[in-house]
A protein has these predicted regions:
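N-proximal low-complexity "stem/linker" segments adjacent to membrane-targeting elements
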Residues: 1-56
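Short beta-strand/turn micro-motifs composed of small residues
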Residues: 37-41, 72-76, 149
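Short, flexible/disordered intra-domain loops and linkers
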Residues: 43-52, 102-106, 165, 192-202
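Short, acidic, metal-binding catalytic loop of nucleotide-sugar glycosyltransferases
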Residues: 56-68
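Active-site-proximal specificity loops/subdomain of glycosyltransferases
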Residues: 73-122
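Short beta-strand-to-loop acidic/aromatic patch adjacent to the donor-nucleotide binding site
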Residues: 120-133
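Conserved donor-nucleotide/metal-binding helix-loop-beta segment in metal-dependent transferases, i.e.
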Residues: 132-165
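Catalytic core and acceptor-binding pocket of nucleotide-sugar-dependent glycosyltransferases
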Residues: 168-269
Length: 269
């Protein structure tokens, strides 16, 4: 665990012990959104060592957005996971045996080919233990786009011009919102073509939804509305691609991004 992850983890533990202690009601969130996270690859002998991190991600999401239908996709049920779902009836555990610990391709394959079957609402908000909302404002990002996530298009004139011309707004999927119709179409292409692909960039979950399908399939490119960079930066930031972030976005992805916000005083730690 690096220093950035340690800082985020300490903050998550502190919040669970204070803000979220004994709390079971976060109010009602939008009925049009399902929240989903993966919980897999944990240590076989101590599977719940880091469960507090995914619990924190869900609780922070509910705190800022209200309680919504919530799905946890896992390779196996664990004691803490089952206890969490029992405490919060809005949480559904979905067992996926194809998830292999340490193999990111198996998660990407599930995102690419099975997302559409994992929810029935208009939108899916994907969160991770290092990617979730930090403030209220979810409604601003619903009903306008089929995908919004931390932008990976660089803050330069020509990259953004090309993105605007061809609707190629490459983005991170670890913390994102995507529409049901996008997931339906992505699943269709997966079953027809991409299920046969080996582990490669084209089928990595981020690239598949925001790059591969946009470049290779006219129907997808013409149908799907991707959030532009300016809107995406208000939604979330991932510091792997530098962007002109001037205030706290709705959420974040990556522990290093969390530290970036903390160093600017946007998060109290």
């Amino acid at each position: 665990m690096n220093k950035a992850t340690e800082m985020l983890s300490r903050w998550q533990r502190q919040r669970l012990d204070t803000v979220h202690a004994n709390r079971t009601d976060y109010g009602h969130g939008p009925d049009s959104v399902t929240v989903l996270a993966y919980y897999w690859g944990a240590d076989v002998e101590k599977p719940d060592t880091f469960f507090y991190r995914i619990e924190s991600a869900f609780r922070e999401t509910w705190l800022h957005c209200g309680m919504m239908k919530s799905v946890i996709v896992t390779d196996r049920p664990t004691k803490e996971l089952l206890s969490f779902a029992q405490k919060f009836p809005c949480v559904e555990i979905q067992i996926e045996p194809s998830l292999i610990p340490g193999n990111l391709y198996t998660m990407s394959a599930d995102c690419d080919g099975k997302f559409a079957d994992r929810f029935s609402t208009d939108y899916l908000m994907v969160i991770q233990d290092d990617g979730f909302p930090l403030r209220s404002g979810l409604e601003e990002f619903l009903g306008k786009w089929d995908f919004i996530g931390p932008p990976y298009v660089r803050d330069k004139f020509f990259p953004r011009l090309i993105a605007r011309m061809f609707n190629l707004w490459t983005a991170n999927g670890g913390f994102s919102i995507r529409s049901k119709r996008m997931c339906d179409m992505a699943q269709k292409y997966w079953r027809e073509i991409y299920h046969a692909y080996p582990d490669c960039h084209a089928v990595g979950e981020d690239a598949y939804y925001t790059e591969t399908l946009l470049r290779r399939h006219r129907e997808y490119r013409r149908t799907m509305k991707m959030a532009d960079c300016r809107s995406a930066i208000r939604f979330a930031y991932d510091c792997v691609v530098e962007q002109p972030v001037k205030s706290l976005p709705f959420g974040f992805h990556r522990a290093e991004t969390f530290v970036f916000f903390a160093n600017r005083g946007w998060i109290q730690i």
